[in-house]
């Protein structure tokens, strides 16, 4: 069975709820999921995971200078090299994500090979578009194994 590590940084709980919804979706597709806060995530959590989800709420001005919050940035610096994992970035936001994903990737530079999927939502649940995107990602992962 494939497995996923879902890491998250949440300010008011919205990103945590989004992470839980992603985990439920993965579990419904027979992928075991573990959700771990960036405050609690350690190197051993990455072992055995086929895919790693990195989630953070969008910090910054309403429509400019979007970026991950400092706690997530510090976590990214300590993340081990995980070039053998499929990577998904996700964020919750109020108005726009702007440069959020670009900034997240910058902080993971040298730790990951590529980002396979980027998910975003204004709500603490996956949208129908998110579900279709994740479904396509899972299909591509299963075809390559």
For each of these PLM feature ranges, what is it?
Residues 1-26:
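N-terminal beta1-alpha1 ligand-phosphate binding loop
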Residues 38-41:
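Conserved SAM/SAH-binding loop
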Residues 17, 25-29, 34-36, 48-145:
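FMN-binding flavodoxin-like domain, especially the glycine-rich phosphate-binding loop
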């Amino acid at each position: 069975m494939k497995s996923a590590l879902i890491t998250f940084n949440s300010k008011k709980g919205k990103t945590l709820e989004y992470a839980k919804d992603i985990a439920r979706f993965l579990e419904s597709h027979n992928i075991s999921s573990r959700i771990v806060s960036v405050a609690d995530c350690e190197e051993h959590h990455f072992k055995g995971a086929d895919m790693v989800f990195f989630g953070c709420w969008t910090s910054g001005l309403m429509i400019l200078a979007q970026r991950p919050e400092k706690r997530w940035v510090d976590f990214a610096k300590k993340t081990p090299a995980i070039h053998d994992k499929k990577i998904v970035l996700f964020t919750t936001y109020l108005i726009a994500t702007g440069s959020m994903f670009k900034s997240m990737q910058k902080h993971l530079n040298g730790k990951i090979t590529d980002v396979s999927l980027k998910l975003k939502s204004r709500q603490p649940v996956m949208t129908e578009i998110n579900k279709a995107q994740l479904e396509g990602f899972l299909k591509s992962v299963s075809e390559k194994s």
